[in-house]
Amino acid sequence: MSKRILVVEDQPDNRQIIRDMLAGTGYEISEAEDGEQALVAVAKQRPQLILMSAQLPTMDGYEVARQIKADPALRSIPIIAVTSHALNGEEKTARAAGCDDYVPEPYSPRQLLAKIRQYLS
């Protein structure tokens, strides 16, 4: 059985880039375009890992992470924040919201896969 990854990203081009990076890895990829869709997808699909953009419509990625981590049935799902905000303190903000890890953009396919495999191996 393949491992499920939920990609939460509002920009179609960025979702496509991640899909392309993960093509051929054997992971089953699903997507959500905003915070509300992400919460519904997590509850229904129970992915093994979430790649979460920080900036999302309806609810930012950090609020989504907080809500997931507040749910005892979901809190064990690793969340990796993927953000273009490589500012000082952004990683601290991501971790404070409940994200298990952080990948600043731009990142290489190798970097992203290494982070994913760290949690799914």
Q: Where do the protein language model's features map onto the residues?
A:
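Charged docking surfaces used in two-component/phosphorelay signaling
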Residues: 16-24
